[in-house]
Amino acid sequence: MTQQVDTLFINALVLTMDENFSQYHHGAVAVQGDSIVAVGPEEELKQEYAARAQEIIDCGGKILMPGLINAHTHVPMTLLRGLADDLRLDVWLMGYMMPVEREFVSPEFVRLGTLLACAEQIRSGVTTFNDMYYFEEDVAKAAADAGMRAVCGQTVMKFPAPDAASYEDSLQMARDFIQRWKDHPLIVPAVSPHAPYTCTAEILRATADLAKEFDVPLHTHLAETAFEVENMRSEHGIPVIPYVKKQGLFEAKVIAAHCVHVDTGEIRTLLHARAGVSHNPSSNLKLASGFAPVVKMLEAGLNVGIGTDGPASNNDLDMFEEVRLAAFVAKAVTNDPTSLPAPWALLMATRLGAQALHIGHLTGSLEPGKRADLILVDISPLHNSPSFKRAADNAYAQIVYAGKSTDVSDVMVNGKWLMREHQLLTVNEEELLAQAAEVAKKIDSFLIEREQSVLSKLIALGGSLEQESFEVQVKVKLAGPDPVLRALKGPEIDIVRKRHYREHDVYFFFDEPSQGRLRYREDDFIDDVKGIVTNVRARLTLLGQKREGKFEDQVLLSRSRYIAPASQSLRFYREYFKPKSEIAIEKDRQRWLIHYKDTEFFVNLDQMREPELGYYLEIKTRTWSRKDAEHKASLASELLSVLDASSGEKVTEDYIDIVHRTAPRVSEA
């Protein structure tokens, strides 16, 4: 008896993307419920199913193929598209994306961004995407509402996130999310430790354990930039892939995004771990991250898919463009036009992509038993005409080298239509665009206000920030250090501790003097016995000092100083703050914390080495009231005499002002 089917597609060029690259030039596909029941020549399937098919669709000679699989993205970031471009990855991520996300990301933001992304992806023939973001359960809800298939990974990292104050909270969110969504017909829940550089070893181990416990994928970024790999070598003595292996990450079903900077041995490690890899050519090109060794990965037998990455670093979700770029880049970097031919490029975006996401049993090819995730592609438009039939691979080449996302006319996922004749059926495109425009206005206002203030940009980076401090201080120019060194041994002074370090300062100057000056400082702490550097500390200080008062002996009361840890490189801060000019200073500092008449003072003996300006003595103490300041100013004057420095030339300028007056700026931004 003839089997009943819901839909019979006929008159199609069927590209199955199965292991044999089977194709049918006059082909047909039969769908019942959520699955494919038959694929083959049109006449055979018409004879078998036409009589009892609820709907017969004449494809008009279009290509009928598996839906494309976006193997790595961050779909809610459609709402951040075009926000910050032409920046290095660290400046883009730490300087713009994360501050804006901390301010704006919410469940509502995530749902809107996801629906917007679903509309874009459906239009470009994507039926499955692999996501990593915050509030991932809301990504899952929106994707399911739109009818798309998705692997949704709840982000976990060491920093406070928009959806969690700690990594423990994120981990619990991931656990709850996985438990609620396991075995959903469209959504595969996952856990996503963001990257080795944003996660501790403990987090990597904990997320791997969670993924193993529920047998779900683990999605992460690995070896995206050379900087990441160099830092890993510097801190742990090994590259990224061996490091995460050591943490047990590969005991889980890993989906590794990027893998740009991996060698042959690391490729073997990924293969033996059965990890999937997402190649993201547009993002890697735009952020200048490098060229992933895709051909070597494929030759080794790795499952490598293709991803768009997030819309804020691409800036679109067009998988046709990604497939084409993947093929072109592979040819360029190998100097071989036969590298990554069209059938294999398309395979990466279909069956290999599904296998990389560990869902190859569900989707990725048109085969009986797999889900009905399929698309129709018109190859008759002007940009894809004429069509040749001479070579077996012509259809693949037409899609990869000349096809556009606008050629996709129809999309089905899990046996349900998401788009018919270019009309979206599950999302309201006009409403989404209007809502997105309103969000963009709010983000614009936030960034415009922030960009007007160096302090606001400093605060936006996150981390601790020590605000206004009041200091009583006095500074004198010395002929040499010996008198002070002898005086410090006197009975009137109680030395609590001493430190010796070299200070490397770079001061940023801005167009508007009211912005103050930003100092990037690296302190090299020196062991005087061994003569070696034992520790390095980096800090940012925003100096907008106002002189609140002046006492006897040129003792000053000053305020307005903001201090934050500097966790990024000098290059990062230069590109982030965009100073008009800068000056570099180097000095050798011996610092004592002392008690004088039951009052705490810092005594700095400084040798200005670059430029060479000789020796200076600074005496400083903090104060919190005018009366206290007057008392401490008097003691500071006494200390000048006790330290045999009262005859030195009094200096009321900061070091940068002395240098600024005597030396030219070292660079103009």
Question: What is the meaning of each model-derived region?
Answer:
Residues 1-7, 14-65:
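Histidine-rich, glycine-flanked metal-binding segment
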Residues 18, 371-429:
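C-terminal cap of metal-dependent C-N hydrolases
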Residues 79-112, 149-168, 226-253, 273-276, ...:
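Active-site gating loops and adjacent loop-to-helix segments of metal-dependent hydrolytic enzymes
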Residues 81-147, 170-183, 437-439:
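Alpha-helical scaffold segments that flank or form the walls of functional sites
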Residues 138-267:
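Metal-coordinating catalytic core of metallo-dependent amide/deamination hydrolases
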Residues 246-253, 295-383:
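His/Asp/Glu-enriched, well-ordered alpha-helical/loop segment
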Residues 462-598, 645-669:
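N-terminal strand-loop-strand beta-hairpin
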